[in-house]
Amino acid sequence: MWSAGSGRAAGPALLGILLALSLSGGRAAKSDAGLVTCGSVLKLFNTQHRVRLHSHDIKYGSGSGQQSVTGVEASDDANSYWRIRGGTEGECPRGSPVRCGQAVRLTHVLTGKNLHTHHFPSPLTNNQEVSAFGEDGEGDDLDLWTVRCSGQHWEREAAVRFQHVGTSVFLSVTGEQYGSPIRGQHEVHGMASASAHNKWKAMEGIFIKPSPEAPGGHDEL
């Protein structure tokens, strides 16, 4: 059985983010195009299966019993926003470009839990379960994901992979869909091998401009 959580309300800061997104249509201005930076709030799009990384206050009915993570086709769901944070405090200053090979945390904006994986089987495929874990952005070392990309920094127009630091699996979707109570949502899981199933692209969101002193920043930003 799946179970609903406590339904914690979003705080004022999170509501402010969502208001800004609604006023901008969920898209950053053209002049902000370029690099993904620390502190940005965005949606992640799986390019193979065309779903956005998603979570919600519904727990797995098997495995860890932690908050579930799925993929959704809708582009306008507020439960698909994630904040880019450093692996440790001070490691990812606000506005600094995310480096290829850098470890980051992806914090779900509306519930404050971090993207997480561990050695539990996923419900539909028996791959590695991916969940959302922690409170107010504080979790553990199994919340760390390495950004795998070409070049020096994570570019918004480029597809990247997220490889889990602790278990080496890649954040993946292979197309399987859940029934009730989250009918039509896709299973998100960890897979051992790099493939088209684990390519992700930055989509709608608020992108913090690179700081002037940050290396690799674009002049027009």
UniProtKB/Swiss-Prot annotation:
Signal peptide: 1-28
SUPFAM superfamilies membership: MIR domain (SSF82109)
UniProt-listed InterPro entries: MIR_dom_sf, MIR_motif
SMART domains to which the protein is assigned, alphabetical: MIR
Coiled coil spans: none
UniProt keyword list: Endoplasmic reticulum, Repeat, Signal
Extent of motif Prevents secretion from ER: 218-221
GO CC, any one term: endoplasmic reticulum lumen
Superkingdom to which the source organism belongs: Eukaryota
Domain MIR: 33-87, 95-150, 151-205
Subcellular compartments: Endoplasmic reticulum lumen
Primary localization: endoplasmic reticulum
PANTHER family membership: STROMAL CELL-DERIVED FACTOR 2-LIKE PROTEIN, STROMAL CELL-DERIVED FACTOR 2-LIKE PROTEIN 1
Protein name per Swiss-Prot or TrEMBL: Stromal cell-derived factor 2-like protein 1
Species annotation: Bos taurus
